[in-house]
């Protein structure tokens, strides 16, 4: 199996690409992205769903508590006790149909 790392667009590269496409300066683009991030964070804190066009959905979900259980160390086979995990909130990020359609 190949372990080659896929190419990634960095934050600065994204700012440059958006600036070139919109003909706005990078400082303004950075302020827009920072503002968007703050708005998303605030919405998620208030359990609101956020959809970013064309179709990326952020949702707050509650992860159920998990009791302590018996497990084993896969390397040695030695039995171990796995700690209980309390109920907590997590962010679920999902690509909607328009994003999936872009790939096909």
Swiss-Prot record:
PROSITE patterns linked: HISTONE_LIKE
One of the Pfam families matching this protein, by short name: Bac_DNA_binding
Keyword annotations: DNA replication, DNA-binding, Late protein, Virion
Effect on the protein upon substituting residue 69 to A: Drastic loss of DNA-binding activity
Location in the cell: Virion
Regulation: Stilbene derivatives SD1 and SD4 disrupt the binding between pA104R and DNA and inhibit the viral replication in primary alveolar macrophages.
InterPro entries for the chain: Hist_DNA-bd, Histone-like_DNA-bd_CS, IHF-like_DNA-bd_dom_sf
GO molecular function: DNA binding; structural constituent of chromatin
Any GO CC annotation of this UniProt entry: virion component
Key word DNA-binding present: yes
GO process terms (BP): DNA replication
Observed effect of gene inactivation: Knockout of the viral histone-like protein leads to reduced levels of the mRNA coding for the capsid protein and to a reduced number of viral progeny.
Induction: Expressed in the late phase of the viral replicative cycle.
Residues annotated as site: DNA-binding: 57, 69, 72, 74, 83, 85, 92, 94, 96-97
Family assignment from sequence similarity: Belongs to the bacterial histone-like protein family.
Function: DNA-binding protein that plays a critical role in nucleoid compaction, genome replication and DNA replication and transcription. Binds to both ssDNA and dsDNA with a binding site covering about 15 nucleotides. Displays DNA-supercoiling activity only when associated with the viral DNA topoisomerase 2.
Subunit structure: Homodimer.
Extra information: Host antibody response against A104R protein is higher in asymptomatic than in chronically infected hosts.
UniProt protein name: Viral histone-like protein
Record lineage: Viruses, Varidnaviria, Bamfordvirae, Nucleocytoviricota, Pokkesviricetes
């Amino acid at each position: 199996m190949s372990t080659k790392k896929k190419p990634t667009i960095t934050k600065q590269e994204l700012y440059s690409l958006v600036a070139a496409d919109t003909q706005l300066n990078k400082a303004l683009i950075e302020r827009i992205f920072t503002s968007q991030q703050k708005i998303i964070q605030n919405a998620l804190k208030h359990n609101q769903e956020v959809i970013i066009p064309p179709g990326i959905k952020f949702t707050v979900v509650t992860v159920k508590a998990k009791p302590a259980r018996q497990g084993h160390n896969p390397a040695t086979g030695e039995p171990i006790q796995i700690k209980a995990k309390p109920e907590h909130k997590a962010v679920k990020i999902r690509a909607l149909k328009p994003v999936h359609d872009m790939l096909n």
